[in-house]
Every structure is written in C-alpha cells, then in structure tokens.
C-alpha cells in the first residue's frame, strides 16, 4: 500500500438515508478506525480544535493509543468540528481513492446527525441555525432599529448569553433596515446575454440569508459590477436558507427541506442558461458540494451544481473570455485579503486574489493574501462555549492581516471579515476599514 495519495481526492455520496448511517455503534467503530489513523499522522493539528482535542485524549491514555480513549469522549472531538472541510481538501493524505478511505468531515457530520436524531441538540443551537427566522425582523421599520439598539447593550448580551448561548463579546450582525430583495428591481435585462467559452452571459443571483437580511450592500455591489460589465441579471424569484447552518447541526432532514425549497427554483434558471451566483462562500459550497453529495441521483440538483459560481470565479472566467471590462480608475492601496475556508475547498483556485491582481495591472493594489481559517466558522464563533477557542484559532490570521498596516481588510466571507476585524482590534492593530471584495472591486471601477 502506498503512503498517501498521488491523486486528487474524490468524494463519495453521503449515504444518509441508509439506516446504518444513524447506527451509533457502527459510527463509533468507524470513528475509532479513523481516529487511529489520524493519531498516527497528526498533519491536521493546526486546523480546528477537533484534532488537538483528539490527540490530547490519546496522549492521556496509559499506552498512548486510541483504543484507550473512552467512546463517550469521542463526542468531544465531534463537537469541535465545524465542517470547514480543510482537513479533507488540504491536509489528509488518506482520502479516497486511497485504500484507507478517510473522510473526516463527513464522519463528523454522521456523528452530528446521530446526536441530532437522539435529541441531543439544544433549542438554543437550533434557533441560532434558523437564519430565516431571526432574519424575519429585517426591513421592518422601528423594529429593526429597536432590535439592533437593544442587541448592543450589555444587559441584552447577558440575556443572549444565558438564553441563546451567545458569548457576550462575540461580534453579531445587525439587521438591515431594507432587505436586499425588497423595494428594488428584481432584474435588469437591458443588455443582451453574450455567452463566453467559459461563462453564461446572464446571471441569476441567489441573494443568501446574510446578504438579504444583514448586509444588502454586498448584493448591491454585485449588481453594480454586473451592470458595469453589461451582464443581464435576475434575482431568483424565491429562495430559502441554503441549509448550511442546519448541516452543521447534523439536521439533515432540514437540509433536505431546504433542498426541496430551493433546487426546483434554481434548476429552472440553470436549464435556461443562467450562471447562478451567490456572494456567500458557504452557500455556494452547499449547492456545489454538500447537497449534490446528499442527492447524487437528483438531476435538478446536479444541474444547479454545474451552474453555480462564486462571484469571482465568474468574473475571472469572464475576463478570460475577453468579456470583462478593465477600466479601473481608483487605487485600492494596501489590501489584506483573507481566503475563507469554504472558498478554498470549492477547488476553484484563488479567484478573488486573481481579480485583485488584475486590478493591480491598472491601478495601485498592494496585496497581502492570508490563507488560513479565521476561526469564526458560522455559529461556532459566536457560541459561549466556543468563542474563546474561535479567537485563539484566529490569532495567526489577525496577526497576518495586520501586516504593513493595510488600508483595507477583506474576506469573501463577511462573517469571517468581521471576526478578523474584532480580533485585530483586540490585538491592538485595528483595521482602518473592512470591505467585502465585491465592494473593493466596485470602488476600483469608480462606481
């Protein structure tokens, strides 16, 4: 047997509807097998807290072997995994097609699904993962202002700590006064659709919960870039949460319901020749990877997968097609750019970095790229139990992002961006300005 893979990793479909998937004994046996291999390798120790937790458990046994770890302690490892997928995509030498067939993230997902089925996921965690529920207040006059103001008070944060398990010091997004999908044209078809070799000539925007409820400006910036490049677009006429927060809980039935709400709508756009673009990497990843692996035989799901683009994957491909304008006018100066985990594991390359370098051919851009997990990881970074760990994981990123006192810090993941800004401020190296990459490209165009 060869030591490690010489081939690109492949992913097996998630056999989540097989009764054995939820069999705890079977899952624990597989965890012991995988943990034993991980213990003998330890390449992933610098990623999330799952691996230090596992290795500490092993090292505390009498003989330093996995068989000495009590099975009930395995769940400590599971709880620290936030499904970033970096171990699978960037570190593990034993992923399929290797004979050892390791898929650590999906094994952790299986364990989380077992916990969820057993009723061991708290109501607090379920509420935090219900983005459409707490986003429902967005855009309601007076209510938005009241909720945002209250959530900034120490009293409210103490209540959120006890009632919702949200750490008092964790950054929390505010609700938007105007939702992205409200009070605006839902399409611009004034331009003809010009297909390129690599890109469809028209775009369907999946707005995402975060852009719709929290930072609609990111969506507006995307639209400005499409308009400037004369690319017709539509905002998809109906959407629900992509399901990523529920996936992180192991609530696969809720993910399936999200799929049933979204895929028929998105498949129509895919079949009509649209590129489907989402400005949140986790949402893009759900439609590119996780939902297709859960429903490998669903033709509509596979059609959506093929049509789904990260924004800069689309714009860079558009440039290679000779169909992107490069009339940049405004220098960006020093930019510290963070590549988020769920952007990296899409296996599309560093497309946002490529875009910044393209801008730098016309105007000044001094780019500092940081390629490491920020530690935020969706709801993980705001939870009382994990926020201090999330800040610890992010420390190398906070330090690297502060290099050369950048004019802007930026991340494709807006949540990671705010987490990094908080960490930099706590380290005494506060960022001058936090801007999403789409916002910076809009600035560079002078729009």
What are these regions (language model features)?
Residues 1-8, 45-50, 179-195:
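Conserved oxyanion/phosphate-binding beta-strand-loop segments in alpha/beta enzyme cores
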Residues 2-21, 46-82, 94-124, 429-440:
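Non-heme iron-sulfur electron-transfer modules
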Residues 16-25, 59, 64, 85-86, ...:
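Active-site-adjacent bridging/hinge elements
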Residues 22-35, 66-81, 227-229, 359-363:
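Short, intrinsically disordered, charge-biased short linear motifs at domain edges
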Residues 31-51, 75-102, 111, 134-141, ...:
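Cysteine-centered iron-sulfur cluster-binding motifs in ferredoxin-type domains/subunits
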Residues 44-50, 54, 87-93, 98, ...:
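Secreted/processed peptides and extracellular or luminal domains of membrane proteins
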Residues 47, 57, 90-91, 235, ...:
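A generic structural-conservation signal
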Residues 102-447:
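Iron-sulfur cluster-binding electron-transfer modules in prokaryotic oxidoreductases
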């Amino acid at each position: 047997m060869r030591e490690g893979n010489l081939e690109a990793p492949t992913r097996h479909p998630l056999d989540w509807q097989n009764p054995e998937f939820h069999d705890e004994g079977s899952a624990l046996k597989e965890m012991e097998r995988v943990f034993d291999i991980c213990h003998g390798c330890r390449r992933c120790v610098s990623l999330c807290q799952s691996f230090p937790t596992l290795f500490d458990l092993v090292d505390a046994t009498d003989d330093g072997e996995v068989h000495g770890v009590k099975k009930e302690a395995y769940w400590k490892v599971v709880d620290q995994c936030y499904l970033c997928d970096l171990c699978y995509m960037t570190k593990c030498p034993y992923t399929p097609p290797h004979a050892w067939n390791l898929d650590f993230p999906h094994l952790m997902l299986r364990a989380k699904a077992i916990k969820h089925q057993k009723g061991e996921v708290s109501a607090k965690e379920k509420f935090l993962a219900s983005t459409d529920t707490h986003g429902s207040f967005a855009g309601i006059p007076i209510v938005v202002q009241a909720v945002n103001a209250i959530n900034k008070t120490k009293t409210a944060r103490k209540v959120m700590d006890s009632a919702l398990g949200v750490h008092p010091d964790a950054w929390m997004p505010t609700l938007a006064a105007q939702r992205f999908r409200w009070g605006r044209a839902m399409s611009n078809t004034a331009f003809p659709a010009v297909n390129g070799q690599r890109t469809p000539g028209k775009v369907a925007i999946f707005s995402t919960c975060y852009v719709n409820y929290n930072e609609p400006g990111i969506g507006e910036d995307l639209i400005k870039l499409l308009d400037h490049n004369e690319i017709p677009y539509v905002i998809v006429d109906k959407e629900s949460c992509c399901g990523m927060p529920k996936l992180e809980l192991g609530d696969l039935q809720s993910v399936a319901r999200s799929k049933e709400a979204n895929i028929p709508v998105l498949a129509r756009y895919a079949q009509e020749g649209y590129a489907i673009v989402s400005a949140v990497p986790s949402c893009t990843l759900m439609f590119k990877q996780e939902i297709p692996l859960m429903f490998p035989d669903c033709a509509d799901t596979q059609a959506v997968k093929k049509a789904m683009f990260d924004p800069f994957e689309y714009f860079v491909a558009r440039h290679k097609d000779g169909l992107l304008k490069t009339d940049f006018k405004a220098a960006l100066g020093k930019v510290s750019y963070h590549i988020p985990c769920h952007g990296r594991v899409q296996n599309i390359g560093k497309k946002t970095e490529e875009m910044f370098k393209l801008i730098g051919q016309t105007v000044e851009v001094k780019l500092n790229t940081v390629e490491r997990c920020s530690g935020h990881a969706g709801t993980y970074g705001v939870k009382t139990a994990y926020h201090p760990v999330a800040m610890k994981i992010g420390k190398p990123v906070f330090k690297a992002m502060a290099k050369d006192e950048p004019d802007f810090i930026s991340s494709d993941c807006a949540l990671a961006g705010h987490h990094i800004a908080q960490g930099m401020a706590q380290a005494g190296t506060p960022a001058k300005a936090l801007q999403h990459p789409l916002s910076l490209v809009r600035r560079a165009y002078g729009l």
